[in-house]
From Swiss-Prot:
It is found in: Cytoplasm. It catalyses: tRNA(His) + L-histidine + ATP = L-histidyl-tRNA(His) + AMP + diphosphate + H(+). Its EC number is 6.1.1.21. PANTHER family: HISTIDINE--TRNA LIGASE, MITOCHONDRIAL-RELATED (PTHR43707:SF1), HISTIDYL-TRNA SYNTHETASE (PTHR43707). This is Histidine--tRNA ligase. SUPFAM superfamilies: Class II aaRS ABD-related, Class II aaRS and biotin synthetases.
Length: 411
């Protein structure tokens, strides 16, 4: 029997984990400073949650979900994104009855059946935020600037915010109709999936990956030309706040994002460092999603950030050095010194990593272990310890010195 992994998944080995911790720690710190609380939702949910929220005509629902039946025949799906689960939790737990504004963040694995490529996997990890209960344009700006702050804290460069407005339920129908009329002229050029989208949700055609219709999309009607006064005022204020904060942005009239629930502001944060797949963060406003699930009228918005792609960027730009505490290897030359070795290890572990050798192995073997572990220092636990003295060897330079146990805390 050969043991392998399904395509599109990976092991995250110990050498890689410091990059994950770096991102998680920076993000958690910033989330909490912006008054977000962590939420953890199930990895699988009822399929209908995603069909209804993410959208029947999206690539995610039509082609990419991992859906299965449980032993009672219920349709379940591994979560392809984080927002629907957060909204379900908001409604099931009646958060809206106690908190007029709810700000949460999540970190965890998502699952989509798509073609694996650089920085993109079928099991991937996202961190994201959701804000429920605020419709003012300032919070759009704050959410975008929070995402930028995370990326800048990770020393990423060449960042640009791409932003658009998709309008609201009042002005969207006119835009949809114009889009439908435009693409109807080219119906025969559309794939069967895009022909279905033409009838059910023509906005999804703008998100199509079919290369044949890229030229058609260039001349398609733009949502900004159909905004009502309220949506235009909202969008103008978001842009003004970004400009006042000196954040680099450009208006992208064709940006619609790959989810059906977005309204008004949608955005991506891109970088030129990752080739074709250059969007690192994506998000937007979803003022009708809670109502879609039968809840009260509740404005909302959020973003999600792909961690695998972010780690790839961090490595490419090589601006951050991951440093571990020094590793001390305690080579025990006699079993009677184990108790002392444990006492010494407790002192050293206040600031350092410690590996304790085995007195049942020759000193030469223990030193080989120390070398294989890439130890920084070796402390020899031998008869000198009876005088409270230790011999320490710098395993990188070969330099040796003696130190009293009482001075270990100074290391």
């Amino acid at each position: 029997m050969s043991i392998g992994l399904p395509r599109g998944v990976q092991d995250i080995l110990p050498d890689e984990i410091p990059f994950w911790h770096l991102i998680e720690n920076i993000a958690r710190s910033l989330f909490e400073k912006y008054n977000y609380e962590e939420i953890r939702t199930p990895i699988f949910e009822f399929t209908e949650l995603f069909v209804k929220g993410t959208g029947e005509t999206t690539d995610i629902v039509m082609k990419e979900m991992y859906t299965f039946q449980d032993k009672k025949g219920r349709s379940l799906t591994l979560r392809p994104e984080g927002t629907p689960g957060v909204i379900r939790a908001y409604l099931m737990n009646k958060i809206y009855t106690t908190k007029p504004i709810w700000k949460v963040y999540y970190i965890g694995p998502m699952f989509r059946y798509e073609r694996p490529q650089s920085g993109r996997y079928r099991q991937f990890h996202q961190l994201g935020v959701e804000v429920l209960g605020r419709k003012d344009p300032y919070i759009d700006f704050e959410v975008i600037s929070l995402a930028v702050e995370i990326l800048k804290s990770l020393k990423l460069e060449n960042l640009e915010i791409e932003i658009n407005s998709l309008g609201c339920l009042k002005c969207r129908p006119a835009y949809r109709e114009a889009l439908k009329n435009y693409f109807y002229q080219y119906k025969d050029l559309l794939s069967p999936i895009d022909q279905e989208r033409l009838e059910r949700n023509p906005l999804r055609i703008l998100d199509s990956k079919d290369e044949k219709i890229i030229p058609l999309k260039e001349n398609a009607p733009q949502p900004l030309d159909f905004l009502c006064n309220d949506c235009k005022d909202h969008f103008d204020k978001v842009l003004r706040y970004l400009q006042e904060a000196s954040l680099n942005f450009k208006i992208s009239p064709k940006l619609v994002r790959g989810l059906d629930y977005y309204t008004r502001t949608v955005f991506e944060i891109t970088t030129t460092s990752l080739g074709a797949q250059n969007a690192v963060v994506g998000g937007g406003r979803y003022d009708n999603l809670v109502e879609t699930y039968g809840g009260p009228s509740t404005p909302g918005l959020g973003f999600a950030l792909g961690m695998e792609r972010l780690i790839l960027l961090i490595k490419q730009q090589d601006k951050i050095k991951i440093e571990k505490p020094s590793l001390f290897f305690l080579a025990i030359e006699n079993e009677k010194y184990i108790k002392k070795a444990v006492e010494i290890s407790k002192i050293l572990r206040i600031n350092h990593r410690v590996e304790i050798g085995s007195p049942n192995e020759p000193l030469r073997t223990q030193l080989k272990w120390a070398d294989k572990l890439n130890s920084d220092y070796v402390i020899f636990i031998n008869q000198m310890i009876e005088k409270d003295i230790l011999r320490i060897k710098n395993f990188k330079t070969g330099e040796e010195k003696e130190i009293r146990i009482e001075n270990l805390k100074e290391l």
